[in-house]
Each structure stands twice: as structure tokens, then as C-alpha cells.
UniProtKB/Swiss-Prot annotation:
Source species: Burkholderia ambifaria (strain ATCC BAA-244 / DSM 16087 / CCUG 44356 / LMG 19182 / AMMD) (Burkholderia cepacia (strain AMMD))
Name of the protein described by the UniProt record: Uracil phosphoribosyltransferase
Record GO biological process: UMP salvage; uracil salvage
Cofactor(s) annotated in UniProt: Mg(2+)
Pathway(s) of this molecule: Pyrimidine metabolism; UMP biosynthesis via salvage pathway; UMP from uracil: step 1/1
EC primary class: transferase
Encoding gene per record: upp
Protein function: Catalyzes the conversion of uracil and 5-phospho-alpha-D-ribose 1-diphosphate (PRPP) to UMP and diphosphate.
InterPro entries from the UniProt entry: PRibTrfase_dom (IPR000836), PRTase-like (IPR029057), Upp_B (IPR034332), UPRTase/APRTase (IPR050054), Ura_phspho_trans (IPR005765)
Amino acid sequence: MKQDSRFPNLFITDHPLIQHKLTHMRDKDTSTRTFRELLREITLLMGYEITRNLPITTKRVETPLVAVDAPVIAGKKLAIVPVLRAGIGMSDGLLDLVPSARVGHIGVYRAEDHRPVEYLVRLPDLEDRIFILCDPMVATGYSAVHAVDVLKRRNVPAANITFVALVAAPEGVQVFQDAHPDVKLFVASLDSHLNEHAYIVPGLGDAGDRLFGTKN
């Protein structure tokens, strides 16, 4: 795990396995099936770091030999909220790690001015729940900011929100940080820049199209 001094709320998961798999995702010749599998695997690996600081309490259990007070996650279970549509490919990896998590959805599409347009919000009960928002790309940052806005407007505290993405552009991270400096953003790579079409460079193309085998 490393950080960039420009972005205090950004955490880059630089584990060799994650970087290896991300390289294969970037390859334009990687098949839809392999892209989907790699996205799931990387998200699972990132999930280990994202959940490192979950609150812990103890529970009395009987082992075959003795009774013991053993650690369990405190409070309500996690909620995983993919930003549609590409975020769906990340939710499976997180559910592999935490299969009892609740799942919500936030649907947005990017308008011609690159601003997000919301078309769907479905969330589990919010009280005392820890939320992980997921979307493979933080390009302009507007969709990520909007997703966090959705939760904060419903009085979810910033400390209970984490955003996870595969790749991000510095421009988008800056937008996210300006809007939500109190929310942690985890990525596998901070890429170079956005091009004139607001695509991340080098990036991995359109994550949704590559995930579902569609064309923009």
C-alpha cells in the first residue's frame, strides 16, 4: 500500500499480484471472459486491504477443546454498492470475500458534458452500516463524487464510506478529494492523465464495454 503526497485520501494497492492482473486487463486483446474474471480477482485482493480496519468485538464460542472469546466483526454487516454498470463486475469479488454483505445499487450515466445523470438508487437500511462503493474507473471523478453524495445526503457518515476503483486519473482524484476529503479512495493504479475524450491514459478502455462485451 502506498500513497501520493498530492492526495491524502488516496491509497494505492501496489501488491504484485494486483499489478500483474491489472496489466492483463489493460491488454486490448484480453477476452471479455478473462477481463471479467480478472476484475473479480483484483477486487477480492483489494478487499483484503479495504476491510483491514473493520471494527472488531469478541464472541464466546465453543471449540472442540475449550470455550474461548474469539474476534468477530462488530455491528452490522457491510454493504457493497456498485456504481452501475461497470461496478457490478467488482461487487462479485467483494461478495466472495464477504458473502453476507448487503448489496445496493447506484445507477448513473455520463452526459455529454461528462457530468453524471442519476437514474437509479437502491440501498439497504443505512443505520450503523459500513458502505463500500465500487466502480472500476475514476476518470473525471464526477460519478464517484455523486455516489458519495447519495450516501451523505442520507446521513451516512464519511467514516462509514469507502470508494474502491481499479484505475484513476489525477484529474478525477483531485475532483473527488475536493468534494470528499474525508472519504478514503482505494485504487490499484493512479494513471497518467485524461485525454480529450475524458478517457484515462493509459487506462484500460471502457470498462463497461469490455466487461459486458458491448460497444460504445
